[in-house]
Amino acid sequence: MIKLKNISKVFNVSGKNLTALDNVSLEVPQGQICGVIGASGAGKSTLIRCINLLERPTSGSVIVDNTDLTQLSDNELIHARRHIGMIFQHFNLLSSRTVFDNVALPLELEKTDKTQIKQKVDALLNLVGLYDKKDVYPANLSGGQKQRVAIARALANSPKVLLCDEATSALDPATTQSILKLLKEINRTLGITILLITHEMDVVKRICDQVAVINKGQLIEQGSVGDIFSNPKTLLAQEFIHSTFHINLPEEYMENLSATPKHAKSYPIIKFEFTGRSVDAPLLSQASKQFGVDLSILSSQIDYAGEVKFGFVIAEVEGEEEAITQTKIYLMENNVRVEVLGYVG
């Protein structure tokens, strides 16, 4: 449904060329949700704006629904954009129009019959859960409600593609989850292909089928969410995944944690990261029995990304130095990532 081929975008800033996108290729199949994740300034917003040619690429092809948008005339492009909805971090609602009238605006611009407009807008407001707010003005809505109005408006022309530009970054966590749930429902019920950009891996984890990691204008890693979470190949992808872990060690451990052992009775605090089959296997208990070490679990978290289970355990590991070393080797051989956080004792 969306195919980017060798997209580059160069801006001229004060007489100097600034490369925002460098030979980016990406494909999103029909009906899937793809997340593009990267830090601020990585090129995410430029990338998504190239898809509907709000930013025209310096080079490369943008193919949406088998049509290369870069080859269209201005009038043809206007027509093609009707099939591409877009929502933004800031909702861009018209304060002088009610919820109903904001959603109706794209249809009015198309000179749609008033009866059809009412039927369409009522259906969309039911879909986003705001039918009872149809006569309310944006000033009297919460942030989450405003984003729901923006989503309904983006769907007014029955697009085949929905672009989401940091659509949840201005929302609180609970509202973010409700908007993500709505986007997933829209994807399932309407079959709309969704491409979203974000700097939050939690967003990707919750609703995406595939993910692409962008850094300094280049896509450095892409694949299914399950594959990326279970086997991230780049340091940046690993860092984004680690950001979804909420590590809480007891305060007494944090205060006494040292980078190196202070004496013979200092024991390591180790983080064990599990993905896929290693999550369900009793590897820690097997290692404890086999090598004679004691593991005191201090913190743990298990979650899902796509259909892949992943998580971590942080434990104080007590035993002979050689036994602890063998424990780490055994777990790494069974696809567990091992990181010594420090020493206590």
Swiss-Prot record:
Family annotation (Gene3D superfamilies): 3.30.70.260, P-loop containing nucleotide triphosphate hydrolases
CDD domains named among the record's database cross-references: ABC_MetN_methionine_transporter
Top-level division of the source organism's lineage: Bacteria
Reaction equations catalysed: L-methionine(out) + ATP + H2O = L-methionine(in) + ADP + phosphate + H(+); D-methionine(out) + ATP + H2O = D-methionine(in) + ADP + phosphate + H(+)
EC number assigned by the record: 7.4.2.11
Topological category with respect to the lipid bilayer: Peripheral membrane protein
Subcellular location(s) of the protein: Cell inner membrane
Keyword vocabulary terms for this entry: Amino-acid transport, ATP-binding, Cell inner membrane, Cell membrane, Membrane, Nucleotide-binding, Translocase, Transport
GO terms for MF: ABC-type D-methionine transporter activity; ATP binding; ATP hydrolysis activity
Record flagged with keyword Nucleotide-binding: yes
Domain (ABC transporter) ranges: 2-241
Principal localisation: membrane
PROSITE patterns in UniProt: ABC_TRANSPORTER_1, ABC_TRANSPORTER_2, METN
GO cellular component: Gram-negative-bacterium-type cell wall; plasma membrane
Family of this protein: Belongs to the ABC transporter superfamily. Methionine importer (TC 3.A.1.24) family.
Protein name, UniProt field: Methionine import ATP-binding protein MetN
Protein species of origin: Histophilus somni (strain 129Pt) (Haemophilus somnus)
Gene (UniProt): metN
